[in-house]
């Protein structure tokens, strides 16, 4: 069964995370149709994601953004995150938030690596939510992280 996956990214981001996520999704399944939209900034993500769910019939959407280092960027990221949560509640569908804050990395090389890895790992989560949700259940409590190294379970 073919599933529709929406991908929304921003021109503000410094890495093309959408292309990375799309490539990974295509590797994982031939049964995924992808609809990509690009918006200017992170606060534009919620409405674009909601439109993909409601108007384009997407089963799930990835929201890819890269907040800057300034305090106002963190505020904007928080507002965008709240908007994404509201859009999920209004549509009863998942929007996977994939934010990479510029200050998470020590330099541009690490930022590029982190953005690509986080986009790929969240694309895998999208695949599992759509096609193999039981896998996610088996991974509960494992301390999995998207991007940097997994934390692992608190107790073995």
From Swiss-Prot:
Single Gene Ontology MF annotation? riboflavin synthase activity
Q: Which CDD domains match?
A: Riboflavin_synthase_archaeal (cd09210)
Q: Which UniProt keywords apply?
A: Riboflavin biosynthesis, Transferase
What EC identifiers does the entry list? 2.5.1.9
Its pathway is: Cofactor biosynthesis; riboflavin biosynthesis; riboflavin from 2-hydroxy-3-oxobutyl phosphate and 5-amino-6-(D-ribitylamino)uracil: step 2/2
Q: Which reaction does it catalyse?
A: 2 6,7-dimethyl-8-(1-D-ribityl)lumazine + H(+) = 5-amino-6-(D-ribitylamino)uracil + riboflavin
Q: How is this protein annotated for GO cellular component?
A: riboflavin synthase complex
**UniProt enzyme class:** transferase
Is Transmembrane set as a keyword in this record? no
The record ties this protein, via InterPro entries, to: LS/RS, LS/RS_sf, Ribfl_synth_arc
Per the record, the GO terms for biological process are:
riboflavin biosynthetic process
Query: Which SUPFAM superfamilies does this one have?
Result: Lumazine synthase (SSF52121)
Superkingdom per UniProt: Archaea
Name of the protein this chain belongs to: Riboflavin synthase
